[in-house]
């Protein structure tokens, strides 16, 4: 358990046990399974915005839809340790995912996802959302890989359909095996 400055709560830091299901289900490549295990009903990519106002609307839309899906449970929030981005609890132990990337993983919720990381100019993206989020029941997973200009999401078909149809989100449905790179984007 760790404490955040100005916060009187203690927060549980995740271990490799909380992300084994992600690590064992993802593989390198350009398909959605480079970020999301092939265990969900539906998948989508959501392009990251380019300006601050669009970021705020994007983040609010994502959190509202994910919150509708998983309001009554805790969420795991993952912050990628790039050396430049805010990872919230910099001295806490990290987990390793994907191709050796280190994440701080903390059990919290939608409110903390919206407020712990400050949005604004930064070396990578400007949004406040964590790079990795999933609820305790693993019913959905959101992952923004450090070198992509989009977010990958897997979950129930109804949730993914709502994300893909939301007017504030530039999202598209993606099938397993399909290149997840959004149109007009280049995979790293």
Labelled PLM ranges:
Residues 1-121:
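Extended, low-hydrophobicity segments enriched in charged/polar residues
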């Amino acid at each position: 358990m760790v404490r955040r400055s100005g916060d009187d709560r203690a927060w549980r830091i995740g271990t490799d046990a909380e992300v084994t299901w992600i690590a064992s289900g993802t593989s390198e490549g350009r398909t959605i399974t480079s970020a999301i295990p092939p265990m969900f009903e539906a998948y989508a990519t959501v392009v990251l915005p380019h300006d601050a106002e669009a970021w705020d609307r994007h983040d609010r839309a994502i959190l509202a839809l994910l919150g509708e899906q998983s309001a009554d449970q805790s969420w795991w929030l993952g912050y990628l340790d790039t050396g430049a981005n805010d990872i919230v609890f910099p001295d806490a132990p990290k987990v390793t995912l994907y191709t050796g990337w280190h994440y701080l993983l903390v059990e919290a919720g939608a409110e903390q996802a919206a407020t712990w990381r400050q949005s604004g100019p930064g070396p990578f993206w400007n949004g406040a959302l964590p790079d990795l989020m999933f609820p305790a029941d693993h019913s959905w997973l959101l992952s923004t890989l450090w070198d992509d200009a989009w977010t990958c999401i897997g979950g129930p078909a109804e949730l993914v359909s709502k994300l893909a149809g939301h007017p504030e989100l530039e999202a598209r449905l993606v099938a397993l095996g399909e290149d997840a790179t959004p149109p007009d984007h280049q995979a790293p």
